[in-house]
């Protein structure tokens, strides 16, 4: 194989490698975004549950007749 053809093949490999890296980075960013959204959703649910339990506790602690 002559040197120009070898250079061209190397450029193609580098281009494919660049595209693969970009795809991996994009997939990683999407995963992080999805995980972050799931964490926020879970946090919201847990906060609501905690508030409900606190309200129930307050009701139980009030003396009857109030």
Curated annotation (Swiss-Prot):
Belongs to the SVBP family. It comes from Homo sapiens. The keyword Cytoplasm applies. It is found in: Cytoplasm; Secreted; Cytoplasm, Cytoskeleton. Changing residue 42 to E: No effect on VASH1 tyrosine carboxypeptidase activity on alpha-tubulin. Residues 1-23 have a biased composition (Basic and acidic residues). Residues 5-52 form a coiled coil. Residues 1-31 are annotated as: Disordered. GO terms for cellular component: apical part of cell; cytoplasm; cytoskeleton; extracellular region. Enhances the tyrosine carboxypeptidase activity of VASH1 and VASH2, thereby promoting the removal of the C-terminal tyrosine residue of alpha-tubulin. This activity is critical for spindle function and accurate chromosome segregation during mitosis since microtubule detyronisation regulates mitotic spindle length and postioning. Also required to enhance the solubility and secretion of VASH1 and VASH2. Plays a role in axon and excitatory synapse formation. It is linked to Neurodevelopmental disorder with ataxia, hypotonia, and microcephaly: An autosomal recessive neurodevelopmental disorder characterized by intellectual disability, microcephaly, ataxia, and muscular hypotonia. GO terms for biological process: axon development; negative regulation of endothelial cell migration; negative regulation of protein ubiquitination; protein secretion; proteolysis; regulation of metallopeptidase activity. This is Small vasohibin-binding protein. InterPro entries: SVBP. Changing residue 39 to E: No effect on VASH1 tyrosine carboxypeptidase activity on alpha-tubulin. One of its GO terms (molecular function) is microtubule binding. Keywords: Coiled coil, Cytoplasm, Cytoskeleton, Disease variant, Intellectual disability, Secreted. Pfam families: CCDC23 (PF15674). Interacts with VASH1 and VASH2.
């Amino acid at each position: 194989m002559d040197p120009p053809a070898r250079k061209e093949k190397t450029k193609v490999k580098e281009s494919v490698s660049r595209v693969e890296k970009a795809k991996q980075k994009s997939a990683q960013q999407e995963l992080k975004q999805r995980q972050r959204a799931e964490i926020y959703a879970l946090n919201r649910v847990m906060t609501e549950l905690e508030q409900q339990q606190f309200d129930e506790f307050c009701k139980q602690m009030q003396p009857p007749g109030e």
